């Protein structure tokens, strides 16, 4: 379903997407379009896109096609979701220690909607770091 969501094909397009949106959250999925985890994540993002249209705009970026941000944002994972609001990187404390991004596929649509809503509400209040509605620190059971 990734072909239904807008793709950004250059670093300039990514910058313009982040800079131009003033009222909504910019959600960018960085990854490889052909990767299995990215496909799962894109499916979830596609299914929630209409539900969060008033809060967020969702874009996809293939890190092989647009390598400009790979070092800056440490895009080494198979799928990475980052959030921006009014040209500011929004951070979310998921309990994983990495507050900059979500670097695993979230397959639950409601969880993703809740995260987007939490970040959007925090961003509107001027917060740069928000607390996730769910703690993902025990996501892996050892």
Swiss-Prot record:
Keyword Membrane in annotation: no
Function: Plays a fundamental role as a protein essential for entry into mitosis (G2/M progression) as well as for chromosome segregation during mitosis. May play a role in mitotic spindle formation and/or function. May have a role in the maintenance or establishment of the steady-state level of the APC complex.
Stored Pfam families: DIM1 (PF02966)
Protein's cellular compartments: Nucleus
Family: Belongs to the DIM1 family.
One example of a Gene Ontology biological process annotation: mRNA cis splicing, via spliceosome
Stored SUPFAM superfamilies: Thioredoxin-like
Keywords, alphabetical: mRNA processing, mRNA splicing, Nucleus
Major subcellular location class: nucleus
Signal peptide interval: none
Highest classification ranks of the organism: Eukaryota, Fungi, Dikarya, Ascomycota, Taphrinomycotina
Summary of subunit composition and partner proteins: Interacts with cut20.
GO CC field: spliceosomal complex; U4/U6 x U5 tri-snRNP complex; U5 snRNP
Alphabetized CDD domains for the sequence: DIM1
Designated name of the protein: Mitosis protein dim1
